């Protein structure tokens, strides 16, 4: 979960795809991000800021203030954007906390941002339904090869 507390400053605009420097900007879409609002997202409590179209920009291009949009939405809403889009949390000038959950979806051949092998060790993952274990990375992506067990790593004995 992400939180923006009273008095928080505006976050620096960034891209979810910034770690993937091997593709120059603009690049093919690698990630789709989603922000689920737990509380109302308002301009005064730090609603997510987005720069529409910035996924098509060169790295040197800087957003002008008039290009930045505040994603105001009621609790229970979801916002989707391409991973190359500039975004960040807005400043919170209110007395309210702003809460949200961000989930990102990447191409199957990219390494996940979170290391699920540390968060969910194999002995725990073996007890999960197979589809859930696969979704969190316990199945290698089809077609790239160079892996020990491309079918299902949990079937290996350690």
Over which residues does each language-model region extend?
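Conserved double-stranded beta-helix
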Residues: 57, 61-80, 84-85, 90-158
């Amino acid at each position: 979960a992400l939180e923006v507390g009273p008095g928080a400053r505006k976050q620096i605009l960034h891209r979810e795809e910034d770690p993937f420097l091997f593709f120059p900007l603009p690049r093919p879409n690698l990630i789709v991000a989603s922000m689920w609002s737990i509380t109302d997202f308002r301009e005064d409590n730090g609603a997510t800021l987005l720069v529409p179209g910035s996924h098509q920009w060169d790295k040197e291009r800087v957003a002008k203030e008039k290009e930045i949009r505040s994603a105001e939405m009621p609790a229970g809403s979801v916002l989707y954007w391409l991973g190359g889009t500039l975004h960040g949390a807005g400043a919170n000038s209110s007395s309210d906390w702003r809460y949200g959950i961000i989930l990102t979806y990447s191409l199957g051949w990219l390494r996940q941002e979170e290391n699920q092998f540390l968060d969910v060790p194999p002995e725990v993952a073996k007890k999960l339904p197979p589809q859930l274990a696969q979704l969190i990375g316990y199945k290698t992506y089809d077609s790239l090869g160079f892996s020990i067990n491309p079918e299902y790593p949990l079937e290996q004995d350690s």
